[in-house]
């Protein structure tokens, strides 16, 4: 496992068109030369959706698209942020007075999350100012983790300016925790793969303690990303945080049903650990203990033996106070079955049978069905795109990322890649002008990329 510090690499900026362009724009904007550059990649989750925050392992890989920041420390305490994309306005604040507005998921707030995470980790009251120019080529709100990549990039920028050191694991944990400043209750997958990724391999990411294991993907097949072009801004919607709460409530009701100390339980994985049984057995417990009809707040209170006031003040998060019903059975069933699929996927990759691509594809298809029917995080466009991808030769296709929009990931035999891309282009993008305009960043094959690092000009 890569537990060491993020790498620092010396580069000839003139030989890298994107770095050179960023350097020139930085100079034009701030009247000085960047001291260093930091990049942090986006990711595609191959399998294991909505289970990291329930305590279960996931199987992502870094994509080649990333966030890239040019940085120039300054002698004042002013933090100045600019973006190469004019859609994202400049922002300036005092480095020692960072305020993050949860109600406004504006681009600079994700930078501030990473900055503040490092500040709080070291207990610093005085921070140096800096000029930063951000350049991202991860499609925003696409489920490829552009926002978390920006948080990670900002964390590594801040650490580098301070001249301090942390391991990749520590950085991932700090950035996962600090993204919650903006109201996103994620589980840590996005930040972990952004730091722990290595070129040429996917990773099984496990939590508590955080660790990453190489997973060699089968030769003869490629992963293709296709963007539905339906944007989903994770922090601006209640869907995601309601699912987090439904999983937490399901864990508590299951724990109470099995006579465990339910009030200490937060995650579905904890119930399985406490009972010491397999995922398959947990699915049977779920069938036995939970019903398919939505639970009202009153019924949850009755199950747990608590008052409505206790439910509101001790369990429900601020952004789920208005919810009247919760689907516990469906969410628990998705989580336990998806966690099992992740382990099966890894086992197939390790055993590498002749029909590995077929087996992995079927696991991806099962995952999408569960996301659509049990977790209800798909949307009509994603379902249509998945169907198109399967129709034109993908062995497996599923939504990736939070869902409710964003991207699909498909497993495609390498020898059919060209015809697959042409067919999907024609069926999903060609007849729709807004999709067609974004297609360059919406349909592409990808291979596992490397993790976050610092560039110094040679």
From Swiss-Prot:
Annotated alpha-D-galactose binding sites: 43, 49-50, 52, 190
Keyword field contains Plastid: no
Pfam families, alphabetized: GalKase_gal_bdg, GHMP_kinases_C, GHMP_kinases_N
Active site: 190 (proton acceptor)
Residue sites binding ATP per the record: 143, 145-146, 233-234
GO function term, MF aspect, one: galactokinase activity
SUPFAM superfamilies from the UniProt entry: GHMP Kinase, C-terminal domain, Ribosomal protein S5 domain 2-like
Enzyme class: transferase
Sites marked Transition state stabilizer: 43
Keywords: ATP-binding, Kinase, Nucleotide-binding, Transferase
Function: Acts on GalNAc. Also acts as a galactokinase when galactose is present at high concentrations.
Name recorded for this polypeptide: N-acetylgalactosamine kinase
